[in-house]
Protein backbone atom coordinates (compact mmCIF):
# COMPACT_ATOMS: atom_id res chain seq x y z
CA UNK A 1 0.00 0.00 0.00
CA UNK A 2 1.66 3.22 -1.17
CA UNK A 3 -1.11 5.56 -0.02
CA UNK A 4 -0.18 8.32 2.40
CA UNK A 5 -2.65 8.29 5.29
CA UNK A 6 -3.07 11.48 7.30
CA UNK A 7 -4.70 12.15 10.68
CA UNK A 8 -4.91 15.49 12.50
CA UNK A 9 -7.00 17.32 15.08
CA UNK A 10 -7.86 20.13 12.67
CA UNK A 11 -7.64 21.06 9.01
CA UNK A 12 -7.83 24.52 7.43
CA UNK A 13 -7.06 26.05 4.06
CA UNK A 14 -7.88 26.04 0.37
CA UNK A 15 -7.53 22.84 -1.71
CA UNK A 16 -6.22 24.90 -4.65
CA UNK A 17 -3.34 26.41 -2.63
CA UNK A 18 -2.40 25.06 0.79
CA UNK A 19 -3.96 23.02 3.57
CA UNK A 20 -2.72 23.28 7.14
CA UNK A 21 -3.08 20.28 9.44
CA UNK A 22 -2.55 20.92 13.12
CA UNK A 23 -2.72 19.21 16.49
CA UNK A 24 -1.19 15.73 16.77
CA UNK A 25 -0.63 15.29 13.04
CA UNK A 26 0.27 11.75 11.92
CA UNK A 27 1.32 10.73 8.42
CA UNK A 28 1.60 7.02 7.65
CA UNK A 29 2.86 5.20 4.59
CA UNK A 30 3.55 1.48 4.91
CA UNK A 31 5.91 1.20 7.92
CA UNK A 32 6.72 4.94 7.94
CA UNK A 33 5.20 7.13 10.67
CA UNK A 34 5.78 10.89 10.85
CA UNK A 35 4.36 12.92 13.74
CA UNK A 36 4.32 16.70 14.02
CA UNK A 37 2.30 19.45 15.71
CA UNK A 38 1.61 21.08 12.32
CA UNK A 39 2.02 20.25 8.62
CA UNK A 40 1.35 22.45 5.58
CA UNK A 41 0.31 20.50 2.46
CA UNK A 42 0.98 22.45 -0.72
CA UNK A 43 -0.70 21.83 -4.06
CA UNK A 44 2.65 20.89 -5.71
CA UNK A 45 3.15 17.90 -3.40
CA UNK A 46 5.43 19.56 -0.84
CA UNK A 47 4.77 18.95 2.86
CA UNK A 48 6.29 21.49 5.28
CA UNK A 49 6.89 20.75 8.95
CA UNK A 50 7.56 24.23 10.36
CA UNK A 51 7.18 23.11 13.99
CA UNK A 52 9.40 20.04 13.78
CA UNK A 53 8.80 16.36 13.22
CA UNK A 54 9.64 12.86 14.35
CA UNK A 55 9.99 10.12 11.76
CA UNK A 56 9.91 6.43 12.67
CA UNK A 57 10.53 3.38 10.52
CA UNK A 58 11.67 -0.05 11.63
CA UNK A 59 15.19 0.51 12.94
CA UNK A 60 15.27 4.28 12.25
CA UNK A 61 14.23 7.34 14.25
CA UNK A 62 14.76 10.90 12.97
CA UNK A 63 13.86 14.18 14.63
CA UNK A 64 14.26 17.76 13.47
CA UNK A 65 13.40 21.39 14.18
CA UNK A 66 11.75 21.81 10.77
CA UNK A 67 11.49 19.82 7.57
CA UNK A 68 10.37 19.75 3.96
CA UNK A 69 9.18 16.60 2.19
CA UNK A 70 9.04 16.85 -1.61
CA UNK A 71 6.52 14.25 -2.71
CA UNK A 72 7.57 14.44 -6.38
CA UNK A 73 5.60 11.44 -7.54
CA UNK A 74 2.44 12.15 -5.57
CA UNK A 75 0.59 13.01 -8.76
CA UNK A 76 2.21 10.22 -10.81
CA UNK A 77 0.89 7.26 -8.82
CA UNK A 78 4.39 6.06 -7.86
CA UNK A 79 4.58 7.05 -4.21
CA UNK A 80 8.33 7.00 -3.56
CA UNK A 81 10.04 7.74 -6.86
CA UNK A 82 11.84 11.05 -6.48
CA UNK A 83 10.74 11.73 -2.88
CA UNK A 84 13.22 13.84 -0.90
CA UNK A 85 12.98 14.66 2.81
CA UNK A 86 15.10 17.54 4.14
CA UNK A 87 15.38 18.11 7.90
CA UNK A 88 17.05 21.05 9.70
CA UNK A 89 18.82 20.50 13.04
CA UNK A 90 18.32 16.76 12.74
CA UNK A 91 19.04 13.80 15.00
CA UNK A 92 19.15 10.25 13.62
CA UNK A 93 19.36 6.89 15.38
CA UNK A 94 19.83 3.65 13.42
CA UNK A 95 18.89 0.96 15.93
CA UNK A 96 20.20 -1.97 13.88
CA UNK A 97 23.83 -0.89 14.09
CA UNK A 98 23.78 1.66 16.92
CA UNK A 99 24.76 4.62 14.76
CA UNK A 100 23.73 8.03 16.09
CA UNK A 101 24.11 11.23 14.08
CA UNK A 102 23.29 14.91 14.33
CA UNK A 103 23.17 17.35 11.42
CA UNK A 104 22.67 20.99 10.63
CA UNK A 105 20.91 19.73 7.49
CA UNK A 106 19.92 16.19 6.57
CA UNK A 107 18.46 15.03 3.26
CA UNK A 108 17.01 11.56 2.69
CA UNK A 109 16.29 10.41 -0.85
CA UNK A 110 14.00 7.64 -2.11
CA UNK A 111 16.88 5.13 -2.08
CA UNK A 112 17.30 5.60 1.69
CA UNK A 113 20.61 7.45 1.33
CA UNK A 114 21.18 10.06 4.04
CA UNK A 115 23.19 13.15 3.10
CA UNK A 116 24.33 15.17 6.09
CA UNK A 117 25.82 18.68 6.06
CA UNK A 118 27.56 19.94 9.19
CA UNK A 119 27.14 16.67 11.03
CA UNK A 120 28.60 14.31 13.55
CA UNK A 121 28.18 10.58 14.09
CA UNK A 122 29.21 7.96 16.61
CA UNK A 123 28.43 4.42 17.68
CA UNK A 124 28.87 5.34 21.35
CA UNK A 125 25.85 5.12 23.65
CA UNK A 126 23.94 8.33 24.46
CA UNK A 127 25.87 10.34 27.05
CA UNK A 128 29.18 8.63 26.14
CA UNK A 129 31.60 11.00 24.40
CA UNK A 130 34.23 8.28 23.81
CA UNK A 131 34.58 9.23 20.16
CA UNK A 132 32.74 11.00 17.38
CA UNK A 133 33.46 11.86 13.78
CA UNK A 134 32.34 15.34 12.75
CA UNK A 135 32.37 16.29 9.09
CA UNK A 136 31.41 18.97 6.62
CA UNK A 137 29.61 16.25 4.67
CA UNK A 138 28.51 12.74 5.59
CA UNK A 139 26.78 10.25 3.34
CA UNK A 140 25.15 7.18 4.90
CA UNK A 141 24.48 4.75 2.07
CA UNK A 142 22.13 1.95 3.08
CA UNK A 143 22.51 0.03 -0.19
CA UNK A 144 26.30 -0.30 0.17
CA UNK A 145 26.24 -0.23 3.99
CA UNK A 146 28.90 2.51 4.05
CA UNK A 147 29.50 5.91 5.61
CA UNK A 148 31.47 8.33 3.42
CA UNK A 149 32.82 11.54 4.95
CA UNK A 150 34.48 14.65 3.56
CA UNK A 151 36.31 17.15 5.73
CA UNK A 152 36.10 14.95 8.82
CA UNK A 153 37.62 15.43 12.26
CA UNK A 154 37.94 12.52 14.67
CA UNK A 155 37.23 13.61 18.26
CA UNK A 156 38.06 11.53 21.30
CA UNK A 157 36.44 12.72 24.52
CA UNK A 158 35.42 15.85 22.53
CA UNK A 159 39.09 16.66 21.71
CA UNK A 160 39.98 16.85 17.99
CA UNK A 161 42.80 14.36 17.29
CA UNK A 162 42.84 13.71 13.53
CA UNK A 163 41.75 15.49 10.35
CA UNK A 164 40.57 13.23 7.52
CA UNK A 165 39.82 14.91 4.17
CA UNK A 166 38.05 11.76 2.88
CA UNK A 167 37.05 8.58 4.68
CA UNK A 168 34.90 5.55 3.82
CA UNK A 169 33.73 3.32 6.69
CA UNK A 170 31.37 0.37 7.06
CA UNK A 171 28.05 1.45 8.53
CA UNK A 172 27.91 -1.49 10.92
CA UNK A 173 29.93 -1.00 14.10
CA UNK A 174 30.69 -4.72 14.15
CA UNK A 175 32.29 -4.71 10.69
CA UNK A 176 35.76 -3.68 11.90
CA UNK A 177 37.56 -5.66 9.18
CA UNK A 178 36.76 -2.95 6.61
CA UNK A 179 37.79 -0.15 8.94
Describe these PLM feature segments:
Residues 1-179:
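Structural signature for solvent-exposed beta-strand/loop edge elements and short helix-capping sites
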Amino acid sequence: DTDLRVAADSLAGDLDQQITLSGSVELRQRELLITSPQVELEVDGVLRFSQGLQLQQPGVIMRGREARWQRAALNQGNAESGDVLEIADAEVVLAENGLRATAEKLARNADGQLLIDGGEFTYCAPGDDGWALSAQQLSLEAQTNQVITRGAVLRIKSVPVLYLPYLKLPMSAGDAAKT
